[in-house]
From Swiss-Prot:
The gene is fgd. Homodimer. Catalyzes the coenzyme F420-dependent oxidation of glucose 6-phosphate (G6P) to 6-phosphogluconolactone. It is an enzyme of class 1 (oxidoreductase). Substrate binds at residues 191, 194, 255, 279. The lineage of its organism: Bacteria, Bacillati, Actinomycetota, Actinomycetes, Micrococcales. This is F420-dependent glucose-6-phosphate dehydrogenase.
Length: 336
């Protein structure tokens, strides 16, 4: 079954506002809410960065049905993977069957400002792989002893583990981490707007390859994608809203070494609107909007989490509930 989620953008909204939008999302019929976990936002002006862990506890207490998770949290530097394992086990006890841990390898802007080292890509991947293994071992075992290169445990126990296991989703944008997601994850996370070939020729084949190493197929995984969408009856307004998230359009080369939100904002604001909009499905017609979204379902994604860039999230949620979600559900019924 296709799941439709809401991205709670912690880089843009204060924690209480984000909580209110999460409650609205549940009322509007969304199936899930995934929150980002940043130490620092992409923009200094008007930026926010509430901590995901306490926020998820409040979200669990304020909702009844939606799946809640991170998209994503980095369990390698400012968080020790053992602390992450304990925190999400506790969340799983408090909201049984409604919590997911989404992990990624991170960005220097969330680690270096605390004086933490930012290793090269090879070490970051090795840390990431080892952190996932420790989290899963702590969730599964009574007493865990591991002597790793980066993380160790000696007779470590998580005493409060949920009866319903917490799924672990692995975010990736390249083939190596995507193979890891297929091999060890319960789900896979990526983002939209990067060109069809990346998904069909690189990521999904790598995911299938990794799954096969664990005697699984893609049907055994939740294929989640963050959908960057800007939908508004006023097309110019939909375009302009993408400027709030111009940093997403910066290349990795343009962002390398940029760890200050003030500088990131300066670089993003220098981009033309055509470029800031390049990562987004920008639409003023609901049928055209759904058609463009559906192309990702046709690729094989089973869980679409919608991220809208505008300040008025209540208006986005209302419009999506009235005009987009019903069309997507109807489309799903037609093809099932």
């Amino acid at each position: 079954m296709l799941r439709l989620g809401y991205k709670a953008s912690a880089e843009q909204f204060a924690p209480r506002d984000l909580l209110a939008y999460t409650v609205l999302a549940e009322q509007a019929g969304f199936d899930s809410v995934f929150v980002s976990d940043h130490l620092q936002p992409w923009r200094h002006t008007g930026g926010h960065a509430p901590a995901a862990l306490p926020w998820l506890g409040a979200a669990a207490a304020s909702t009844e049905r939606v799946l809640l998770g991170t998209s994503v949290l980095t369990p390698t530097l400012r968080y020790h993977p053992g602390v992450v394992a304990q925190a999400f086990a506790t969340l799983g006890c408090l909201a049984p069957g409604r919590v997911t841990l989404g992990v990624g390898s991170g960005e220097s802007m969330n680690e270096a400002p605390l004086g933490l080292p930012w290793p090269d890509g090879k070490e970051r991947y090795a840390r990431f792989r080892e952190a996932i293994a420790l989290i899963q071992a702590l969730w599964a075992g009574e007493r865990v002893t591991i002597d790793g290169t980066y993380y160790s445990a000696r007779d470590a126990t998580i005493y409060d583990r949920p009866d319903v296991p917490v799924p672990l989703y692995v975010a990736a944008s390249g083939p190596s981490a995507t193979r890891l997601a297929g091999r060890v994850g319960d789900g896979f996370i990526c983002t939209s707007g990067k060109g069809r070939e990346l998904y069909t020729e690189t990521l999904l084949p790598a995911l299938a390859e990794g799954a096969a190493k664990s005697d699984r197929t893609l049907a055994d995984l939740d294929l989640m994608i963050e959908m960057k969408v800007s939908y508004d009856p006023d097309h110019a307004r939909a375009l302009e809203a993408t400027r709030n998230w111009g940093a997403l359009a910066l290349t990795s080369e343009e962002k390398v070494g940029v760890e200050d939100p003030v500088e990131m904002e300066r670089l993003a604001d220098a981009l033309p609107t055509e470029r800031t909009a390049s990562r987004w499905i920008v639409s003023d017609d609901p049928d055209e909007h759904v058609e463009r979204i559906w192309s990702y379902v046709e690729m094989g994604f089973t869980h679409l989490v919608f991220h809208d860039p505008r300040a008025d999230q209540a208006a986005f949620l209302e419009r999506y509930a009235e005009e987009i979600l019903p069309r997507l559900r109807a489309r799903e019924r037609q093809v099932s």
